[in-house]
From Swiss-Prot:
Tree of life domain: Bacteria
GO biological process: proteolysis
Gene symbol of the encoding locus: pepB
EC code(s) of this entry: 3.4.11.23
Annotated source species: Haemophilus influenzae (strain ATCC 51907 / DSM 11121 / KW20 / Rd)
Subunit structure: Homohexamer.
Protein name from the UniProt record: Putative peptidase B
Disulfide pattern: none
Length: 434
């Protein structure tokens, strides 16, 4: 079916304020002559077309630009990927941008949607490294990428006790990816950014076990790792020329005779001890290892990204990623990038007093809040702050609840969204110019 864009109103026969009308083998999307609104209308129209069972379309006419093509792709995408879009010819620069967005978006959405039976922690880090290597090979040089994978008991032996503790209960070994994208080829080059992603490939909740309904989508608990990998790959496609390091902290959180238990205490490389009071608050336990490693690189800034708390999702739903940081300038830069890329982020509070709300009688801190009515997203961030020495500057925590939708909407199908890839790539590139 051919799809065209029009600035005229649809005939009343198609309904009041209809955004779609049909003529023979053609569909027409009716715009409102408002940039952001029109992009939304195009995405909504794409969802409607997929909902009608249409799988193959051709976008025709002169009005299709980069942003309209991208909006249509986002709405037309489904997890089964049983569709085909023939895009119009664009000029070289927007054409390359569109293809890079689709390439990185497909990677992120595809890997988040993948079942845990095939995407184990080791497979996740291998796939992430392969993707970045491929991006570097296309847009820079393959030799710009070096990496190592630490898995199984090696994690414990090398002091990555958070990842090891969470993942030791599964037959699928926990793993950590340490990847260095260094286009300068200079081993002494400064690090622009360190990216730290949570990669829990399945989260049963452990002994603090989730109900079935809450567990049904927990193959997606590696959304933070996928998002940061996609963002780095997209930044490379856009010409990133400074050094960035990627740390993915990956495990399965299962119940077994080897699984960690409530009351266990983890002592991290930086000397901080943490008592486990809820095994379903495991994401912060694995991220701590990555943050310590990232902080030791003395980067320009650190971003960690995780599907971390139900509290953030309760606050902003699946429609926004939550941002928590004490660095107002870095937050400002992030929101400038988000606005430029038309992606939704929302700031939640993080203050020093939150750090006193995770007390433990047996360790330095606990992995859940210790006050009767706590701000769950904020106290989770407070936990992470104990693993960043100068936590008030150059560190962003993103609780990425918009990575996945359990139910569809008028904009998105069920499954992963890819929201955030462009914003985080934009932030890296804009900060690299300063």
């Amino acid at each position: 079916m051919q799809i065209t864009l029009s600035n005229t109103l649809a005939n009343d026969a198609w309904g009041k304020n209809a955004i779609l009308s049909f003529d023979s083998n053609k569909a027409m999307i009716h715009l409102k002559n408002n940039g952001k609104t029109d992009r939304t209308l195009v995405q909504q129209a794409a969802r409607k077309l997929r909902g009608q069972g249409i799988k193959e379309v051709e976008l025709v006419g002169e009005k299709w630009d980069l942003e309209f093509c991208w909006a249509f792709y986002q709405g037309f995408y489904t997890a089964k990927q049983d569709y085909a879009i023939e895009f119009p010819h664009l000029d070289d620069e927007p054409q390359d941008e569109l293809l890079a967005r689709i390439e990185c978006g497909d990677f992120v959405r595809g890997i988040i949607n993948e079942p845990a039976q095939s995407l184990t922690p080791v497979k996740l880090v291998e796939r992430a490294a392969e993707f970045i290597l491929n991006q570097a090979d296309i847009y820079n040089e393959k030799s710009a990428v070096s990496f190592k994978i630490i898995s199984g008991e090696e994690l414990e032996q090398q002091g990555y006790h958070g990842i090891w503790t969470v993942g030791k209960g599964s037959a699928n070994l926990p793993a950590m990816l340490q990847l260095d994208f260094n286009p300068t080829q200079d081993s002494n080059a400064p690090v622009l950014a360190c990216l730290v992603g949570k990669g829990i490939t399945f989260d049963s909740g452990g002994y603090s076990i989730k109900p079935s309904d809450g567990m049904s989508t927990m193959r997606t608990d590696m959304g933070g790792a996928a998002l940061l990998t996609g963002a780095l790959g997209f930044a490379i496609a856009r010409g990133l020329n400074q050094r960035v390091k990627l740390y993915l902290c990956c495990a399965e959180n299962l119940v077994s005779n080897n699984a960690f238990k409530l009351g266990d205490i983890i002592t991290y490389k930086n000397g901080v001890s943490a008592e486990v009071l809820n095994t379903d608050a495991e994401g912060r336990l694995v991220l701590a290892d990555g943050l310590i490693e990232a902080d030791n690189q003395n980067p320009g800034f650190i971003i960690d990204c995780a599907t971390l708390t139900g509290a953030a999702k309760s606050a902003v739903g699946n429609d926004y990623h939550s941002v928590l940081s004490m660095d107002d300038e870095l937050v400002k830069n992030l929101f400038q990038s988000a606005q430029a890329e038309n992606e939704p982020f929302w700031r939640l509070p993080f203050e020093d007093f939150h750090r006193s709300q995770i007390n433990s009688s047996f360790a330095d801190i606990a992995n859940i809040g210790s006050v009767p009515v706590g701000a769950g997203a904020s106290t989770a961030t407070a936990f992470l702050s104990y693993f960043v020495k100068n936590y008030k500057q150059n560190w962003l925590h993103i609780d990425c609840s918009a990575t996945y939708r359990k139910s569809g909407s008028d904009l998105w199908s069920v499954g992963a969204t890819g929201i955030g890839v462009q914003t985080l790539a934009n932030l890296m590139l804009s900060r690299s110019l300063k």
